[in-house]
């Protein structure tokens, strides 16, 4: 039995799931909002907030961890320049998930995740 399994599986093997979350995190930081399924949005929230927290820390080790996760190098540098000013008064909750209409093809629950 898998008691207290805290990792959302998202119907994919671990390597594909990690790559998908990295791509979604990169897209969210670049665009500011992403439309995806509700389950993916909830999984994405943890990763995006972790990257913003690293950017607020601003140390060299944090920057290297972010460079190893986010696909775009210039995006990491921009995040580390803007995040400490933008989120200085927040201790968390950098994203907002808003439910939208179900997807037309398979009626999956959809959501918009955006940076606050």
UniProtKB/Swiss-Prot annotation:
BP terms from Gene Ontology: translation
Highest taxon in the source lineage: Bacteria
One Pfam family, short name: Ribosomal_L17
Gene3D superfamilies, per database record: Ribosomal protein L17
Gene Ontology molecular function, alphabetical: structural constituent of ribosome
CC terms in the record's Gene Ontology section: cytosolic large ribosomal subunit
Keyword annotations: Ribonucleoprotein, Ribosomal protein
Keyword Protease: no
Family: Belongs to the bacterial ribosomal protein bL17 family.
Annotated HAMAP family: Ribosomal_bL17
Subunit record text: Part of the 50S ribosomal subunit. Contacts protein L32.
Name of protein: Large ribosomal subunit protein bL17
Species assigned in the record: Parasynechococcus marenigrum (strain WH8102)
């Amino acid at each position: 039995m898998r008691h207290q399994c805290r990792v959302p599986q998202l119907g994919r093997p671990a390597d594909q799931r990690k790559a998908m979350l990295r791509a979604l995190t990169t897209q969210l930081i670049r665009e500011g909002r992403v439309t995806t399924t509700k389950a993916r949005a909830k999984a994405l929230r943890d990763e995006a907030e972790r990257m913003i927290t690293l950017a607020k820390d601003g140390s060299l080790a944090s920057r290297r961890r972010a460079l190893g996760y986010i696909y775009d190098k210039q995006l990491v540098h921009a995040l580390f320049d803007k995040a400490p000013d933008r989120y200085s008064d927040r201790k968390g909750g950098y994203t907002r998930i808003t439910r939208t209409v179900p997807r037309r093809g398979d009626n999956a629950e959809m959501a918009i995740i955006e940076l606050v």
